[in-house]
């Protein structure tokens, strides 16, 4: 690799020229993509992955968004509706759909990584360290997978779309097509996480604030002139408005909108997502970090102290190596709990943002555009996911991939500045700066290694890759590799559904958390949500009560058939609650099927 990549400004170049960094990226990209393709079949379908395809399948059958489905993540299903419909057109049985959509995820993820590499270089080419920053950020993003689930979910799609939005805004020079692209991508991200409207509000405020103060900004120093111009706001807002109008037409035309008064509260707040006050949200934000990381309090206090010292030090440029070592130590301390105990991909991304923030403070010529257009939107995305998810720190850290990009840019820019500062000096300061650079790069390497290790040896809700030796041979999970026991269990349950599946018409309610069953059945879903909360007697009765309210609003959705798991059917209190209905009962070892008499 050309060692001059850490030095100052570089001349403009053709992005397709076969430079050393491009060749290195090509080999890294091929290696990681090959790894991802190898990993694709491993792991059976879980409730989470089942849900991602079950909701668009429901809409494909004709059910209405926001009316017939009450899951809060349902709007992201609109993005998957076209490919799901295409797949069922080509494969009417839906066989192997989960494996196919894992490959589709790899395509989206890989293309986003290439886009990231190209646009980091294009938009930061004048900055020190832009080439290794582009290579490192794209490699970390490519190896990473949200919760180690290789699926197109509202999580992975919102991350990928926000990456595209932020990088395009960072490279903006007033091009109309880029603004249209940003509007489309951001609209898709909002479908995945509606709380991202907060990001649009922050953008609108920034545009207004700049319009008020633009006369006070010296000419040539308005670095955010294109991103926060009135033109940018108008085009992006116009695109979002057009797409929002199309969504409203799709969702509400021909529907009884008055029903939304009953439905929206049930979508927003349920047993898994209870309503919280603003004070509870802030306390919960602190608590979710404190409970999940034994080092959080010392890390927080150390970070505040270090931030204050750096800000107060007017000669910080001479002491940057020392501060960088301190920041690297804080990052490692925060990462220790996750690296040694949890070993989940989600929690290993946020530490990049800690190191990146301090690197930004230490840069003499700060990359304001990357901080405002990548790092801050990434932080807003984390907060939005905290609001919408019940996963706590896992959700917050899992979507910090956007801030990770800016953080890596800041670290390599800082290293480039420090190299330029001491490259002609043979002194202790020079060797100490080299040592600090090695420490910070080691932190990045350790985190990258932790993500790679977890991705290689673990699968979501599985014990480990080594035990996944059996391929599923039938149904929607065909082609996936899991344990022999789970493969046999899936195939047994699939075969038991044959009599019910062959009855093509009617509505069916699967009172089970095995959402994949809906994709095996051509009948319409009779449930208020594809995701049903099942468990003890009280929870099951609450879920049944919710279904009854759903059937009151939509009598046409009352089930013709009800599938109840065998363990739930053994609960006499729960089964007695069905006594108000007339039905014919058929039972087997694994389930009870109620044929309802309407």
Predicted regions and their residues:
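Membrane-lumen/periplasm interface segments of specific transmembrane helices
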Residues: 229-307
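Short hydrophobic/aromatic helix or loop-helix immediately within or flanking a transmembrane segment
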Residues: 53-57, 68-99, 103, 189
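Membrane-interface transmembrane helices that cradle and orient dolichyl/undecaprenyl
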Residues: 128, 162-180, 217, 358-369
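Transmembrane-helix motifs of polytopic, lipid-linked glycan transferases
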Residues: 103-127, 306-311
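Short periplasmic/luminal acceptor-recognition loop of GT-C membrane glycosyltransferases, typified by
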Residues: 71, 447-534, 560-568
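Membrane-interface alpha helices of multi-pass inner-membrane proteins
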Residues: 166, 178-194, 200-205, 378-389
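Perimembrane helix-loop-helix junctions
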Residues: 4-7, 171, 186, 199-244, ...
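Short acidic/glycine- and proline-prone juxtamembrane loop motifs at membrane-interface regions
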Residues: 147-158
């Amino acid at each position: 690799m050309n060692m001059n990549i850490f030095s100052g400004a570089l001349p403009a170049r053709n992005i397709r020229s076969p430079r050393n960094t491009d060749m290195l990226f090509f080999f890294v990209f091929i290696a990681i993509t090959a790894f991802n393709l190898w990993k694709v079949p491993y792991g059976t379908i879980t409730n989470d992955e089942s849900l991602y395809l079950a909701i668009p399948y429901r809409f494909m059958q004709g059910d209405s968004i926001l009316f017939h489905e009450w899951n809060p993540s349902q709007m992201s299903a609109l993005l998957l509706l076209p490919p799901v419909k295409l797949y069922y057109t080509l494969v009417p049985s839906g066989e192997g759909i989960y494996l196919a959509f894992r490959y589709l995820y790899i395509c989206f993820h890989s293309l986003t990584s290439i886009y990231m590499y190209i646009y980091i270089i294009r938009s930061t080419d004048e900055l020190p360290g832009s080439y290794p920053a582009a290579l490192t950020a794209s490699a970390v993003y490519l190896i990473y997978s949200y919760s180690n689930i290789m699926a197109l979910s509202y999580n992975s799609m919102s991350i990928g779309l926000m990456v595209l939005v932020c990088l395009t805004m960072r490279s903006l020079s007033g091009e109309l097509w880029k603004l249209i692209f940003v509007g489309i991508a951001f609209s898709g991200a909002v479908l995945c996480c509606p709380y991202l409207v907060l990001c649009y509000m922050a953008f609108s405020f920034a545009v207004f604030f700049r319009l008020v103060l633009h006369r006070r900004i010296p000419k040539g120093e308005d670095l955010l002139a294109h991103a926060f111009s009135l033109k940018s706001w108008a085009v992006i807002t116009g695109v979002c408005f057009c797409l929002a109008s199309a969504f409203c037409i799709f969702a509400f035309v021909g529907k009884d909108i008055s029903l939304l008064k009953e439905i929206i509260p049930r979508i927003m707040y349920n047993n898994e997502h209870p309503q919280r006050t603003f004070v509870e949200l802030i306390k919960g934000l602190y608590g979710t970090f404190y409970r999940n990381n034994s080092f959080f309090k010392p890390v927080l206090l150390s970070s505040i102290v270090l931030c204050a010292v750096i800000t107060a030090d007017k000669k910080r440029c001479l002491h940057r190596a020392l501060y960088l070592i301190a920041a690297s130590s804080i990052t490692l301390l925060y990462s220790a709990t996750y690296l040694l105990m949890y070993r989940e991909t989600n929690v290993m991304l946020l530490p990049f943002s800690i190191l990146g923030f301090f690197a930004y403070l230490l840069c003499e010529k700060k990359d304001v555009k990357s901080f405002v257009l990548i790092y801050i939107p990434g932080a807003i995305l984390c907060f939005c996911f905290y609001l919408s998810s019940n996963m706590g720190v896992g959700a917050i850290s899992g979507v910090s991939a956007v801030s990770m990009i800016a953080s890596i840019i800041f670290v390599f820019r800082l290293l480039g500045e420090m190299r330029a500062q001491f490259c002609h000096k043979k002194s202790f300061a020079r060797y100490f700066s080299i040592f600090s650079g090695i420490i910070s790069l080691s932190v990045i390497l350790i985190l990258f290694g932790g993500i790679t290790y977890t991705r290689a040896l673990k699968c979501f809700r599985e014990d480990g890759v080594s035990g996944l030796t059996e391929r599923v041979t039938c149904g929607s999970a065909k082609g996936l590799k899991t344990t022999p026991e789970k493969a046999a269990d899936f195939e047994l349950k699939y075969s038991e559904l044959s009599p019910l599946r062959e009855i093509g018409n009617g509505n069916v309610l699967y009172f089970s958390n095995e959402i994949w069953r809906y994709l095996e059945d051509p009948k319409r879903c009779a449930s208020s949500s594809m995701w049903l909360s099942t468990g003890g007697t009280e929870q099951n009765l609450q879920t049944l009560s919710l279904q009854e309210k759903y059937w009151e609003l939509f009598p046409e959705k009352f089930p013709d058939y009800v599938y109840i798991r065998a363990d739930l059917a053994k609960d006499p209190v729960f089964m007695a609650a069905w006594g108000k209905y007339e039905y014919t009962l058929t039972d087997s070892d694994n389930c009870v099927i109620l044929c309802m008499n309407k």
